[in-house]
Amino acid sequence: MNSLADTGFIVALIDSQDSHHREVKNIYLQQQKIIVPQSVLAEVAYLLGCNAGISSVIQFLRLLKTSRFELMALTEEDLSRIGDILEEYQDSRVDFVDASVMAMAERLNLTIILTLDRRDFSLYRPQNCTAFTLLP
């Protein structure tokens, strides 16, 4: 089954000291392919660098080549949809990266989001399904 990853999921997977690491690793091993929007990659690199050091960023970048992760660029269609999502949910303070995950999931017709951010993704009503399945 294919899924789409948000930042917190990846950070917890890479950082073995993270309180969600074991649970996230188990979910990761159950996935066939995990789409990673480029916007998520930038946020992951920033957070890993700040919290776990540059060696963790390097580890993640090397892991991308041999892992279940597939890096995907945002399209013009995604950018337009991100703008719509940010406008519709501006009172909820959904951020650009979360909106990019939502938009890409809709475009790819994916319903499983790997995230630790249950608040934003639970609020959102996607166009491609009733609600996203959030793991873990």
Show the residue positions of the predicted features.
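Helix-adjacent hinge/juxtasegments
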Residues: S55-T75
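Amphipathic alpha-helical segments within well-ordered protein domains
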Residues: G8, A42-A45, G83
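Short, well-structured N-terminal submotif of metal-dependent ribonuclease cores
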Residues: M1-V36, G49-R62, Q127-N128
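Active-site neighborhoods of divalent-metal-dependent phosphate/nucleic-acid chemistry enzymes
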Residues: L71-L116
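Acidic, PIN/NYN-like endoribonuclease modules and their adjacent C-terminal/linker elements
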Residues: L108-P136
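Histidine- and aromatic-rich ligand-binding microenvironments
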Residues: N2-D6, V36-P37, V94-D95, D117, ...
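Short active-site oxyanion
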Residues: M1, Q31-I34, R68-E70, R107-I112
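Alpha-helix/helix-capping structural signal
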Residues: G8-F9, S39, E77, R119
